[in-house]
Regions:
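N-terminal signal-anchor transmembrane alpha helix
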Residues: 1-13
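Perimembrane loop-to-helix junctions flanking transmembrane segments
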Residues: 21-36
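Interfacial non-cytosolic loop connecting adjacent transmembrane helices
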Residues: 24-28, 91-115
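Core segments of alpha-helical transmembrane spans in multipass integral membrane proteins
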Residues: 34-58, 77-81, 85
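Hydrophobic cores of alpha-helical transmembrane segments in multi-pass inner/ER membrane proteins
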Residues: 42-56, 117-133
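Cytoplasmic juxtamembrane regions at transmembrane-helix boundaries
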Residues: 56-79, 139-161
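Individual transmembrane alpha-helices with interfacial aromatic-anchor signatures
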Residues: 108-125, 146-153
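Juxtamembrane boundary at the C-terminal end of a transmembrane helix
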Residues: 160-171
Length: 171
């Protein structure tokens, strides 16, 4: 699944809008269409981060060395928080728009529904999958207490990054 999740980022980074026109914000589509350098770079980096996430998910299926295990649990905790947070923001925004508590331009209502019913839940499920894989990995190790600490630090770091991003309006 992680590999499939990376495909759109690479497709869009190469200049195609396949699958994006009705599911992605028009402002982001414009940046991609205009080939804005920093945005194209973000698409490439995002694609590679998704590939890293796929490798991490696969890596969490087996015992690894002590250092690699710590790093994987740290990243697994961070990925859990980032994905669940991101998905919950999409869902919460969509629910508020659907309930009439927030307004959206009429041409964005359909897009809001994509984020509410597809993208938000997709991110949440991905985050929960990372949580399950990371928890399972930790439970099979001898140094559970130490690994839990690495996972907690990764999760806390991701939460702080997400909060800072939300407060500054960057993400």
């Amino acid at each position: 699944m992680g590999l499939l999740f990376a495909v759109p980022s690479f497709v869009w980074a190469m200049g195609s809008s396949l699958g994006a026109e009705s599911t992605v914000s028009p402002s982001l589509m414009k940046l991609a269409h205009d080939r804005v350098t920093w945005f194209v770079a973000v698409l490439w980096v995002t694609g590679f981060l998704k590939l890293f996430g796929a490798a991490l998910g696969i890596g969490l299926t087996r015992r690894r060395g002590r250092r690699i295990g710590r790093l994987m649990v740290f990243c697994g905790g961070g990925a859990t928080v980032l994905l669940v947070w991101h998905g919950c923001l999409f869902v919460a925004h969509g629910v508020l728009v659907e309930a009439g508590a927030l307004s959206a331009a009429p041409d964005l209502i359909g897009l809001t529904r994509w984020y509410l019913y597809l993208w938000g839940p997709w991110f949440i499920v991905g985050g929960l999958a990372f949580a399950a894989a990371t928890t399972r990995y930790v439970r099979r190790q001898d140094a559970r207490r130490e690994l839990r600490l690495y996972g907690a630090v990764g999760a806390l770091g991701a939460l702080l990054l997400s909060l800072a991003s939300a407060v500054t309006g960057i993400g």
